[in-house]
């Protein structure tokens, strides 16, 4: 059974590429979406800049007993005017109500839209290949596919950019490479906020500063900047014996 819960979310539209540092062999890799600890760290740094270190320490102390708010890791979304499509991580265990062809397609996806998640978790229905479509690495419903298919739809790409470092002692230059994630115009990401609206308003100035300062690494060359909007969305959750973590 799927239960719909209304939650606040922060929708982020990237202005340029992001560098979310991850371990790599020889080249620093990049993640596509920032995790919750990266987002929280960025908010805290900006919170301290605006309100001072003491205010930040008072805020952090609250999390040891009764956290005033919780945030999820970032998840992908597609901006389509008034028909934005939000995605969840694809369940690790495929639902048992999929037919054979859809089951094979399900393995190839990485994320699943809210509507598709609701469809495959309704145990009373048997989802077929006609109900869902695979668009790049995302599983969407047939209706969502029809909204997207005629648009310039490219999935988020990871690439490597050459950088130059100058030695402080020798003044010699050396080339190194870092990973970046490039967002096409229709793509962005969001994170969920669980807490009182007063706390969301309290950290909103920090989010505004963070959008100018940048989120993630390589901010000195302009990476990680974005625009954001706060919305209330209906999040599907399945009442079952398994759970899905969003952080």
What residue ranges belong to the model's regions?
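Conserved active-site/ligand-binding neighborhood in enzyme cores
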Residues: 1-247
């Amino acid at each position: 059974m799927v239960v719909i819960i209304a939650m606040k979310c922060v929708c982020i539209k990237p202005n340029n590429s992001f560098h979310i540092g991850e371990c790599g062999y020889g080249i620093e890799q990049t993640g596509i979406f920032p995790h919750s600890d990266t987002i929280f760290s960025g908010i805290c740094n900006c919170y301290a800049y605006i309100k001072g270190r003491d205010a930040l320490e008072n805020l952090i102390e609250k999390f040891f007993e009764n956290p005033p708010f919780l945030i999820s890791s970032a998840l992908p979304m597609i901006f389509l005017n008034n028909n934005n499509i939000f995605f969840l991580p694809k369940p690790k265990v495929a639902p048992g109500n999929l037919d054979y062809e859809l089951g094979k397609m399900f393995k190839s996806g990485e994320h699943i839209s809210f509507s598709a998640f609701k469809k495959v978790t309704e145990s009373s229905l048997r989802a077929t290949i006609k109900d869902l479509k695979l668009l790049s690495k995302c599983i969407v419903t047939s209706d969502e596919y029809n909204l997207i298919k005629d648009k310039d739809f490219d999935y988020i790409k990871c690439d490597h950019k050459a950088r130059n470092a100058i030695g402080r002692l020798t003044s010699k230059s050396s080339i190194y490479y870092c990973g970046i994630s490039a967002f096409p115009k229709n793509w962005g990401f969001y994170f969920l906020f669980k807490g009182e609206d007063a706390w969301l308003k309290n950290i909103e100035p920090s989010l505004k500063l963070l959008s100018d300062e940048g989120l993630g690494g390589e901010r000195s060359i302009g990476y990680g900047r974005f625009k954001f909007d706060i919305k209330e969305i209906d999040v599907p959750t399945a009442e079952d014996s398994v759970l899905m973590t969003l952080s």
